[in-house]
Amino acid sequence: MTRRYWNINLEEMMEAGVHFGHGTRKWNPRMAPYISAKRKGIHITNLTRTARFLSEACDLVFDAASRGKQFLIVGTKNKAADSVARAAIKARCHYVNKKWLGGMSTNWSTTETRLHKFRDLRTEQKTGRLNRLPKRDAAMLKRQLSHLQTYLGGIKYMTGLPDIVIIVDQQEEYTALRECITLGIPTICLIDTNCDPDLADISIPANDDAIASIRLILNKLVFAICEGRSSYIRNP
């Protein structure tokens, strides 16, 4: 895997608050190598380590995107949801930003059935068939469609399991992470000072609570994916 320059700037990360961790009482001792200091009761992440692992993650997604691989971005907490959707849409990735439904990947056949139902209902709505049904039936199907749009809208074009999963918050998305580990799907994970750095394939130590921090990390990864996709288009 070729190393590239991704313009990862320590000052920019500081401005985004990437270095702010959790309170010292909430830390995971396994994060010790990634912590540079304690300040006013909170741990401070070593941004040099952040830059190193973010750069490795960018190299990985660039390489994967240049070979036509598919990505899934997962981040369901309120602070991350909008940034996840915007990043995924920009890079033409799949995403889950409302709730990870248990078994979404490990029980893919069930997810696939739901997606087929979702696509059928969308087609019926677009063609006006729903409005020609009795009111009660139409209302029930519209509620189903709304529910499916909320939870599966970001993966509506998925036709199989993703090649790489990017996870915004390890603790919040622990079920998704465990499913990826079970299936052997490579993962890139933002990890705060209360997380386990050994679970994901690439763990990026960073503030997973601040919107600016989440957005900065996602923007770097998305840029690398887009660059990789451009390379794939030029050299299919």
UniProtKB/Swiss-Prot annotation:
Q: Name one GO biological process term.
A: translation
| Domain of life assignment | Eukaryota
Q: Which UniProt keywords apply?
A: Chloroplast, Plastid, Ribonucleoprotein, Ribosomal protein
Q: Name one GO molecular function term.
A: structural constituent of ribosome
As for subcellular location, the record says:
Plastid, Chloroplast
The family database entries (PROSITE patterns) matched by this protein are listed as: RIBOSOMAL_S2_1 (PS00962), RIBOSOMAL_S2_2 (PS00963)
Cystine connections: none
Which HAMAP family does the entry link to? Ribosomal_uS2_B (MF_00291_B)
Which family does the entry's similarity section mention? Belongs to the universal ribosomal protein uS2 family.
Name of the protein in its database record: Small ribosomal subunit protein uS2c
